[in-house]
Each structure stands twice: as structure tokens, then as C-alpha cells.
Amino acid sequence: MLPKIFYLSLLPAALGHPHLQPRLDNGLARTPQMGWNTYNHYSCSPNETIVRSNAQALVDLGLASLGYRYVTTDCGWTVADRLSDGSLTWNETLFPEGFPALGKYLHDLDLLFGVYQDSGIKLCGSPPDNVGNYEDQDARTFASWEVDSLKYDNCYSDAATGYPNVNYEPSTSPQPRFANMSRALAAQNRSMVFQVCEWGIDFPARWAPALGHSWRIGNDIIPHWRAIYRTLNQAVPQTSFAGPGQWPDLDMLFVGNDILSIPEEQTHFSLWAILKSPLTIGAALKDDETSINDESLQILKQADIIGYNQDSLGVSASLRRRWTEEGYEVWSGPLSGGRTVAALINWRNESRDLTLDLPDIGLQYAGTVKNIWDGTTAQNVKTSYTAKVQGHGTILLELQDTTASGQYPGDTFATSTGSSTTFESIYGVTTSFRYNITVKLSEASSSSDVKIQSTASNKTITAQVSASGTEASAQIPLLAGSSNSITIVSPQSVDAITITPPNGTYFPNTAFTTIGDADTVSCGAGYCQPVGSKIGNISTNGTARAVIPATAGTKYLAIDYINNDVAFDSAWDWGSNSRNLTVSVNGNKPVRIEVPLSGQHSELFGPGKGWWDTATIGVLTEGWKDGDNDVVIGNEGGESGFTSYGPDFVGLRVL
């Protein structure tokens, strides 16, 4: 397999993989929940007419039949005080027929009844005061109302600091408060979906699956395009925790709120869906003043994309490659039936052609490539796929009948003339003379060798035929890119070739010299993998430098970094959950990449506060020469508003 973005497991072996975290398993949310919520459009000012009108619209517009069934009234439905017996009640002015009647109305439409409550002393943006222990009583109330789901928020919850509306650095973990309500709900004779809404505090992916069916990965989505990038950067280290009954919640959808352009809405919906987020509509579908526009409605009704979200395999897509300066990136993941979904995001606000190299998502060939947003289908796609995409839009693809990367069947990739067979569309992740090729012959050869010629070199390579007479192996050169070709001369016909990239050479941070403010930091045992230390304070005044021997050409670097600079307060502004990293080779123009979060432990209480968790990201670099190369890891451009500090640097592998 070619190098890709991946996350090192930092758990002790006895604790297992994140996929195997204990989870609440009551048969609900086997796929991500879908529905509608009042908050994004109506804020904390819902009423009975609004909820009923939009619920009816779910049915009338054909959304309910596609799976959008949970109808949740968010903040603003309660009154200032509980009843004399301590139980919750609704605001009779806003909901004159009451919540039990609202639930019956929804159930009669074959919809599901969702309510909202808070783990603090009052609800976000609305009463009542909740001082005391009301979880058991509230759970009984919700069960008696025949509630189907509960969104449980996190406002006014930190006693040690006087219960402020919001505290992103609480004195204790929010986990016990959510655990109390989880236990209370479990004690009822009615199963309810429990949505943990802790805003990403204390890295809930480690504890929320045991308590609820979904957890908010970060702060609220805001009505701006930049919120998409910020949210995806926070999702990166959490995708491996997704699975049946435990879903990372990227927050409600802004599709249909007349805030994003149509291509932006397509990107928003596509990525929320393939990352297996709950799909909760936040737009006004139909009320006395508003109805959703048809283009946005068709996005919400895109059946293929809903199918990816609800796929029985239940595996989230993950970030595979990012090109910051070029303004695009690739996410992909597996689907049931051996299919693959891939999203190529155009971060630039201009229409252009973009190319997906299939090996970046682990594939070499696809018999069918379905382009969802432009409605076309391509057949027999070899190595690369190119399509036009609008500014801020996404090329969303479903790939079927695929071949794994590095596998080149002759009947697909080759043409033969006499004893010569030429394979086209050969992909190289890096420029190197150390690719390993295995030639598979159709029958045993009487010859002792075959001749191999790569367009990356004018030299002919002789490969010895194995004892079986059906295979020959050698090392060959390839250039970075998808335009290589290989010609094989053999008296026997060639069935296929297999090519694997070089392992490369690893250079830990200890091989680098720190300059200026940059410094080396030791980590706890088993962390900052695979080195056990890192270089921090990388900035415009702090760099790490090493002399690295290599051959000439364009080189792929697999960079081990650490970033747990979580955007909480800054999420309301320009916080992006990313840090800026630059790599300069031999004084050439640096390659810049904004790396996402890597932390998979609590930013408050976890080992190293999440700053010991390594991730790997790939970047292609120019300017390498034969012999020694001067390599500088820095943060050029940080002073221009990217980020003041780069991520911490663990090491890199040169392929």
C-alpha cells in the first residue's frame, strides 16, 4: 500500500483499538440518526406551530421516507421554574397543546420525538434552573412522554467556576454528568437515542460511546463557509472511533439556510455524510414565512449520499492527502459490497479541473466511477480520474469493481507486440530507484531472465526468473506521478505486474538540530511515537534542520507531527484546528501544509494533554539532489496569519 495519512495507536495493547471502545448497545442508532432540529434557524425561540409545520414538511417533501425522522425541539421550550414536584414542563404559551400531544402528533406522522435538556444548572439560552439532581426524574418524564431521543447539552455546568454559561476548560471532566443521565435513561422501560453534546471537551470519543449514541466532536457550527474546514480538521483524529451505535457528530446541517452557496452546501452535506455524522437538518423546511429552496432540498434528498451515510459497514471516511497551497484534499472510506467512496474538496473559490490519483485512496483501477454531483459515470478508470469542480465544491465519487494500488493486470494496463509488453499509467508516489516490481508470467519460462525498461531511466534492468519459472522480481526507477510506463521483454506473455513503493529512510527529530526558539521535549513512555520525543516551538523564530542524504528528484515525505491546538473560543471566529508547517529543501521555496489535529486524548486531563499523540501526513517536495540535502522544518508564513506556531515535529520518512 502507498503511504497515506494514518494514526498511530497510542493505547497500551491491553486496551485495544479505538474501534473497540465500550459502547452503549441498546439496538438504537445502528446507522447515524437523521432528522430535523429547530436550533439552526429558530435558535432558542421554537413554538408548536413551527415544529408541527416543519414535521409535516418532512413528510410532504419526501424527506421522512429517506430517513429524516427524528424531530427535535431544541432550547427554548421550557419555563423558568419546574413544577412543584420538581418535574420539567413546557412553556404553555409556545406549546399550548403540550409536549405529550406534540409527541403523539409526530408519532402519528411516523416520525420520532426528540427533546433537549442540559447537564448544567440551566439550559443553554433558556430556563429552567436545574440546581439539584433531576436526571432520574427527567428520564422518567421523557419516557412518560414517549420521547425517542434526547440531545443533552453542556451549558452552566462547571461548579468550581460559578457555573458560567460556557467554560471550555472546566475543572473536572463533563463525563460524570453525562454518565448520570445515561444511567437514568437506561433505567426506563423505553429506549431513547442519547446525543452527548459536550462540544468536544475532554476528547469525548474516548468516553462518550459508552454513554450515548453520538458525541459532538467540537464547538457549534457557525453560519460561515470557514466552519466546514474547522470542523473537518477536528474530525480527523476521531474518524476511527465511528461505528454502529457510536457516531461522531459534526453538528447540524446548514444546508437550506441560504448561508452557503450550492457548491458549498454540496461539500458540507457530502463530508458530513461520508464521515458518518448524524444528518440533522437545521433549515426551515416550511413555516408561515419560509420554505426551503428546491436546490438545497435536492441536496438533502440525494439518495446515493444518504446511502453512504447509512451504509451497513459503518466505517467513516478518513483524510488521505492534503495539498494546502494548491487548495484541495482527498477523503475516502470503504462501503459495503467492496465499494469505495471518495471526496475531492476544492477549497479555492474558483471552478477548475482536479485529478484524483486512485493510489492516494488505496486503489489502482475502478471498473465504474460514479460522479454524484455532475451525474456522470466513467468506466475502466486506470490510476487517475479528472473532473471539473465548482469553487468550494466537491467531486464525490463512488468506485466499484476496484483493484488495490500497485496491482496492474495486463489485460487492463498493458499492450503487447511480439515479446514486448508495455504497461501504461504506472503511478509513483515519489521519485526513486527503489520500487520493487514483480512480473507474473502466463506460463513457466525457459529463459533465465526478463528485461525491464522504465521511462524514468534509459537503463535496461535484468530480472532473474524465479525457480518456478513464472515470476521475476527487480528494483526499478519511477518518477513521482501517474505518467510512468514500463516495458517488459519476455518470451512468455506477461499476465500482470505488482509494484510496491520503497520503504524509505526514517529521520527522527533527534537527527535534527534546533535553531532559535525551537526545542526538544521528551514525552511519556509509549508516546510521541515512534521516537519518544519531539521538537516544539516551531515558529518564524524556531526551526529544525538536518542534512539528509538522498537521490535527486521529487520526494514524498511522511511527516510525523503532533497538533492538539483545539479551537474552542476561536471557533466563533477564525479558529481552524490546524497548524502551519513548512518544509524547505536546499533553500528552495518551502512546501506549506496546514496539518489537522492529531490528539486522541483529553486536552485537559489526558497524557500530555493530547500533545503526545502522533499523526502522519504526506507531502511532496521538490529540489532534492544526489548526495547531502539541507532540510528545514519551519513555519514560514506564520507571521502572515496562518498560525504563530507550527505543530510539534516527531520525525519524517523520505521515500
Swiss-Prot record:
GO biological process, one term: polysaccharide catabolic process
Chain sites annotated for binding substrate: E198, W199, G200, I201, D202
Glycosylation sites: N47, N91, N180, N189, N349, N436, N458, N503, N537, N541, N580
Keyword ATP-binding: no
Gene Ontology CC entries for this record: extracellular region
This protein's UniProt keywords: Carbohydrate metabolism, Disulfide bond, Glycoprotein, Glycosidase, Hydrolase, Polysaccharide degradation, Secreted, Signal
Subcellular location: Secreted
Catalytic-site annotation from UniProt: D153 (nucleophile), D220 (proton donor)
UniProt family annotation: Belongs to the glycosyl hydrolase 27 family.
Entry function: Hydrolyzes a variety of simple alpha-D-galactoside as well as more complex molecules such as oligosaccharides and polysaccharides.
Protein name (Swiss-Prot/TrEMBL): Probable alpha-galactosidase D
The encoding gene: aglD
